[in-house]
Amino acid sequence: MEINGVEIEDTYAEAFPIKIARVLITAATKRWALVAATEATGFATSVIMCPAEAGIERLASPSETPDGRPGVYVQICTFKYEALEEQLLERIGQCVLTAPTTAVFNGLPEAEKQFNVGFKLKFFADGMESETQIAGRKVYKVPIMEGDFLAEENIGAIAGIAGGNFFIFGDSQMTALTAAEAAVDTIAELEGTITPFPGGIVASGSKSGANKYKFLKATANERFCPSIKDKIENTEIPADVNAVYEIVINGLDEESIKAAMKAGIKAAVTVPGVKKISAGNYGGKLGKYQFKLHELF
């Protein structure tokens, strides 16, 4: 299969189950909503070494937020619900409560699983907290130096999916990077998914385990490293490719990830010099979800 003259390899992305909480952060301005969201989703690229995977899902206009202010939806992902609640308390408590003019609301109010994060955060007020209603939602008011921090009582979570992905092969580093940026920018407009790596782009895609250093649980995926393609017998790098970037996608459900992969790939192949699109899988060892590239189109 080719799209815009770019080969789409007949392969699939392998993904795995994960628990996802969705939080709506609002602030007086879009700038401060984004600052708080960026801080709250830091150090969360991969569960390989991070305590969570997290990222910004999308912006929310004042017309769709409970308090009528600019907002940002974020997703926070862990393997277990217990760890997810800890991450919510730590990230909201340290990165949102401390940020100017912010408030937090439940991004999954209909979810069966609910954490009483706002209820627990109210204890920061040391007895001076109070309750109010905003757009029919129970919210706690925590007095702080600038005024009041507002936190909805509960934050919802569901069983989602992590590890949807695709690889972009370019004739140069700048070609591949430009295509990856185009893909991430397009995915950022969609609902239900995040791209948790720096700027949404993975420069150092890994394989599970190691060939030599067995004490590591993930190491460089040498088959996709252009600088050593002449040294690797089973290299996946064509002669005319000199850089590869991976886009990793987590999402609330399969359809959201499929939509993000499709949109991202369509954006990437518009960049001249992109030679091929592929995806990462581990023969079923990593997860139960398979997103076949050809079936996306």
From Swiss-Prot:
GO cellular component: cytoplasm
Keyword match Nucleotide-binding: no
GO molecular function: formylmethanofuran-tetrahydromethanopterin N-formyltransferase activity
InterPro entries given in the database record: ForMFR_H4MPT_ForTrfase, ForMFR_H4MPT_ForTrfase_C, ForMFR_H4MPT_ForTrfase_fd-like, ForMFR_H4MPT_ForTrfase_N
Reactions performed catalytically: N-formylmethanofuran + 5,6,7,8-tetrahydromethanopterin + H(+) = N(5)-formyl-5,6,7,8-tetrahydromethanopterin + methanofuran
GO BP field: methanogenesis, from carbon dioxide; one-carbon metabolic process
EC number of this enzyme: 2.3.1.101
Pathway(s) where this gene product acts: One-carbon metabolism; methanogenesis from CO(2); 5,10-methenyl-5,6,7,8-tetrahydromethanopterin from CO(2): step 2/3
Broad class of enzyme this protein falls into: transferase
UniProt keyword terms in alphabetical order: Acyltransferase, Cytoplasm, Methanogenesis, One-carbon metabolism, Transferase
Cellular localization per UniProt: Cytoplasm
Function description: Catalyzes the reversible transfer of a formyl group from formylmethanofuran (formyl-MFR) to tetrahydromethanopterin (H(4)MPT) to produce 5-formyl tetrahydromethanopterin (5-formyl-H(4)MPT) and methanofuran (MFR).
Oligomeric form and interacting partners: Homotetramer.
Similarity section: Belongs to the FTR family.
Official protein name in the record: Formylmethanofuran--tetrahydromethanopterin formyltransferase
Organism: Methanosarcina barkeri (strain Fusaro / DSM 804)
